[in-house]
Amino acid sequence: MTKKEFSQALRRGLGSAIIELKRVQNNMDYSDIVLRYCLRDIAHDPQVEGTKGYYLYSAVKILNNPEMFLGKIIDRFGKRLYWRLSEQLYDILCCFSDDGYKDADDALEKKYNDLKNRLPTLLKYNLVFCEREQFDSLMIRKLSSGFSTFKQSVYDIGEMITKRGNVDCVFFDFVLDCAKDKFGEKRVNGFISEMCEKSTAIKFLVDTLEESELSRREYQENMFSESVTVEYLLQNARAAASYEYPRFKMLRYRLMFVKKASDEDYMKLAYTVLREKDDTVKALLLMIFWRKPFPLDITPLIEYSKSDNALLSEIALEVLKYVKDKRIHDLAVQLLAEKGLDSFALGLLMKNYRKADDDIIRKLIVKTSNVLQHVQSDIADIYTHHRSETAFPILLHVYQRGECSHCRGNIVRAMSHCKVLSNEILEECVYDSFEDTRRYAKRLIARNSK
């Protein structure tokens, strides 16, 4: 493996990078690359992947000189960082701490104290830094030290709220849930009730959390108790069409509609879609058919998929991907030939795949040096619904070049479904950056060894 190949594999979180470090004698030649990625956020989508902190620490440990990394990681962690990088460094330092490095403990404690002192004084809370979320993570980490440490965190929160004069400086609800899971709901609730009697700040925080939870429940109950008519959808679609990202404005109404809509309601909505003249409004109405078959002839939807209006084209393809029809297969092949993977047409093959499509997909996939997340997802959907031994070159390329480690886990499952998951790939997956993939690989290896 060249340094460039190692760098690409490490950035993507592939187990092959860890195996390479174990294999080569002069693995310190890779130390600059490992350090660079420790100090740089390399997560693609942390909401589904988490961070690659544990994975990077695995690489650091193999190099047999972790102290060389620890000081630089601590220096970086001590600065004011945006949330994603801070979480990655936090996860690495937690691994150091678990292995007994006191300097890592001190760095985590210092960050906790810095945020404890700074958060009450800020005029506003920048979403780039998400420092209240960072403080949450540090409080959750401290739970491992025992109930007395949790109690101290509650005292600290009381002081922060008193200093600021309101509860804006902390979140705490997730920390409270974690504490209940660890120490028991009865014990935690008893202590919080006791603190509410002693501290007006803590009582104010608890009351605020309870009011927020009550408001959330009332909102959900009200949202799903309302019956949304087609006329109401049309009215809101026209209002949403003027926004920069209009489809997000319709998500709530889609949930409300599908909860109670009858077949007659869907039929009425379908005719409304066909009659609508404005393409953006038409698209917003069409998106209500979320995993629900369009009840009329799909010929107009096929035409919409070729529209110059990007939103209408995109949503038409999303609706058509759940329909099995020869015309949709032909459309997918046509769009892939004309626009390639940028056409979002791969998803149409989930229900309309044919063996001959492997060659079409392979020729497009191997041209891409970096496979985008939506392509990874579509490939995984196709080959977990259909079995093809000739799909291995496609799946291998997407596995090695995909940008999302969560989607890579689904690619590995597709390999298994198609019976092309090799022992070499399975061994790599044991060291993958995504925890679910590591677990899946270990489970398969254990099953195969019986």
Predicted segments — roles?
Residues M1, S227-A237, D263-L269, D325-I328, ...:
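Repeat-mediated protein-protein interaction surfaces in helical alpha-solenoids
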Residues M1-K4, E424, R443-K450:
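Terminal, non-catalytic domain-edge segments
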Residues E318, H397-V398:
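Long C-terminal tail modules that include membrane-anchoring/sorting signals and adjacent low-complexity
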Residues A17-D29, R40, H44-N65, D75, ...:
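Structural detector for internal amphipathic alpha-helices that build alpha-solenoid repeat scaffolds
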